Regions:
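Phosphate- and other anionic-substrate recognition elements at nucleic-acid/protein interfaces
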Residues: 1-192
Length: 192
């Protein structure tokens, strides 16, 4: 039903950004869609009506890899969910260490730079704030996060992915949901 208005519903985007299994949650009204990248062929494609995975593209060097991952984010935003966005990205975990920390930072830096270039503002949400918003505990583990997600959304990802454990991409999908939800709730409560 259209009232002739060209205004589009604001889409709340939650991005759990990583090198191996990034995930995006798109909230539009009461509709949820989830996207993720994976290295596992069995998780490539549509897992359900609102959950879709895609295999990582081949890459030649780290910068090429980071560019491909950010290309995927823009594919989800522009090709699958064009519109008015409020974007939230999970912040860095202070537990990250070693050489991998630099690649994580470079990877996310490229995404943030590209979002800025396209005049798409974003906010970061601290991991402990996400966990506390989901479970009431800032140090919640993956299983606690999953149980909160299942209770809240009624989406049984273990059943959909035919697995007993909360690994990738399940934990990434859960995190992307709470990045969007907690980020949005915190940003609206800070405006009052």
């Amino acid at each position: 039903m259209s009232n002739g208005s060209t205004t589009k519903t604001k889409k709340i985007i939650g991005i759990d950004y990583s090198l191996t299994s990034p995930a995006i949650c798109v909230m539009s009204g009461d509709k949820l869609n989830f996207y993720y990248l994976t290295n596992k062929k069995k998780y490539d494609g549509k897992m359900s009506d609102n959950i879709e995975g895609q295999l990582h593209d081949d890459w030649d060097n780290p910068m090429h890899r980071f560019g491909l991952i950010s290309d995927w984010v823009f594919y989800v935003l522009y090709d699958l969910h064009e519109g008015n966005y409020e974007i939230f990205i999970e912040g860095y975990s202070y537990g990250s260490k070693g050489q991998g920390l630099f690649q994580i930072a470079e990877n996310c830096g490229i995404l943030k730079y590209r979002l800025e270039q396209d005049v798409l503002s974003y906010k970061t949400v601290v991991p402990s704030v996400i966990k506390k918003g989901a479970t009431g505990k800032g140090n919640a583990d993956k299983d606690m996060m999953y149980e909160a997600f299942l209770k809240e959304t009624k989406i049984d990802l273990k059943k959909i992915f035919d697995t007993e454990k909360v690994g990738n991409p399940i934990s990434d999908i859960v995190d992307s949901y709470y990045v969007a939800k907690v980020g949005y709730e915190n940003s609206t409560s800070n405006k009052s």
